[in-house]
A protein has these predicted regions:
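Noncatalytic, beta-rich nucleic-acid-contacting surfaces in large DNA/RNA-processing enzymes
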Residues: 1-428
Length: 428
């Protein structure tokens, strides 16, 4: 299919998504974000990747399953419109589905933290939405269109078939791939790889053919420079557990009630024992009072910090840093930088212009903080210097927001059907 036709198809799908999500009129903020991202896709020629995402998302919806896209593309308007209706990237806002009223109140990063309200024009209950996912960190991902997918074990074969059929219609083959894992001392399934037009598994060089942990014939993608277009696919236990709860309880994800009180949800979420040790420890330590704060804590658990004297191999998680580094703990207590968005906002409050704040945030969050002390002290509070000088990687908010939503869903299952939850999770 010519690129122009794929782009028109993408526009058509997005327009239907906008009409479905905003039935009383599309807010200007949503239209601006959509048009901006569409221009990036048109310039980069990556429309096909978004159409494939839509096909996979629709297949998951038909199977009453969910998928997760773990990189920065998760926080884009295009992904939200094309099938993943979890993370609206706009600022926290109210929207009236009856008359189209739209407003972005101050003081909340996540729309679910806004108090219930009625439309001042027509009196109908307002929809609360938005996760404040800045486009500064998603623009490059939009242009690359580099999707990775997390599936449940049950949906994994279906997802692979959708990918295979998508490329077969375009005269190309998508075949299984595997990657060498030093930690396991073996090849492990990596997902799929899209072969050049006219090539099949039989015509690929024998040096690239290996067997994965299941014994299946795969293309070796350990050296990405030697193979074309790998698609990273991963199985995740979290989605397996969610599907089991949905199946055993008879309550679909889409049928779960409106979010309950934050206090109840946090207690139930910790009681599920689904968050890992570090996530539970940080949640108990910080005692988040809002849904947005819960999500920020989960985002912070994705961050990496340098261990002084440990070389480039050994990195600490936030939990580990807080355990042994007293100076870091004091800095974090006063300036709890959970995510790149949080650091960007702090720099803006300290007087940085937008361009300078983004430049510094990118340098710090990638572990490239190599400015001299005088330069650092010019832009950062002194108690933040220790913290920022040792950041190896600082995550965006999207992963924590997505994971937080799934944990909150599971907490609602525990709250609504506790016996089913205990039976599915722990067999009791």
């Amino acid at each position: 299919m010519p690129m122009e036709d794929m782009l028109e198809m993408l526009k058509s799908c997005c327009r239907r998504g906008l009409e479905r999500l905003y039935p009383a009129g599309v807010p200007p903020a949503a239209m601006r974000r959509y048009r901006h991202e569409l221009e990036l896709v048109e310039r980069a020629g990556t429309a096909e990747e978004y159409l494939l995402f839509r096909e996979i998302s629709k297949a998951a919806e038909r199977a009453f399953s969910k998928i997760y896209v773990p990189n920065s593309v998760q926080g884009t308007m295009l992904v939200y419109l094309l099938g993943d209706h979890d993370l609206n990237p706009l600022s926290a806002h109210y929207y009236c589905t009856a008359c189209g009223y739209y407003t972005e109140p101050k003081g909340a990063a996540v729309g679910l933290d806004l108090p219930p309200a009625d439309c001042p024009h027509c009196g109908k209950p307002l929809r609360r939405d938005g996760f404040s996912l800045r486009r500064q960190w998603s623009d490059s991902a939009v242009e690359m269109g580099a999707f990775s997918y997390w599936f449940s074990n049950g949906f994994y074969p279906t997802g692979c078939r959708v990918i295979e059929q998508h490329y077969r219609k375009r005269g190309r083959r998508a075949v299984p791939s595997a990657c060498w894992r030093d930690s396991a001392d073996r090849y492990e399934s990596h997902g799929m790889v899209v072969l050049p037009r006219g090539r099949t598994m039989d015509t690929m060089p024998e040096t690239l053919k290996i067997r994965d942990e299941f014994g299946g014939l795969c293309i070796d993608v350990t050296d990405l420079d030697k193979v074309p277009v790998p698609l990273s696919l991963r199985r995740t236990e979290l989605l397996d557990r969610m599907e089991a709860l949905q199946r055993e309880s008879g309550i679909l994800f889409s049928e779960l009630p409106v979010i309950l009180s934050t206090r109840t949800l946090l207690q139930d979420m910790l009681a599920t024992d689904i968050p890992d040790k570090e996530q539970r420890a940080l949640l108990r330590r910080q005692k988040p009072a809002t849904i947005g704060a819960i999500m920020d804590c989960l985002t912070a658990c994705c961050n990496l910090y340098e261990r002084p004297g440990g070389g480039n191999i050994r990195h600490d998680s936030l939990y580990e840093k807080l355990q042994w580094d007293e100076q870091f703990a004091r800095s974090f207590a006063e300036y709890p930088v959970y995510s790149r968005e949080a650091l960007y906002a702090l720099l803006r409050r300290e007087g940085c212009c937008r361009e300078r704040a983004f430049e510094l945030t990118e340098s710090i969050r990638r572990g490239w903080w190599c400015f001299d002390p005088e330069q650092r002290e010019q832009w950062l509070p002194k108690k933040l210097l220790w913290q920022c000088a040792r950041i190896v990687y600082l995550s965006g908010r999207a992963p924590g927001c997505w994971r937080g939503l799934q944990y909150l869903r599971m907490a609602q299952y525990l709250h609504l059907v506790p016996q089913t939850f205990y039976r599915v999770m722990w067999g009791v």
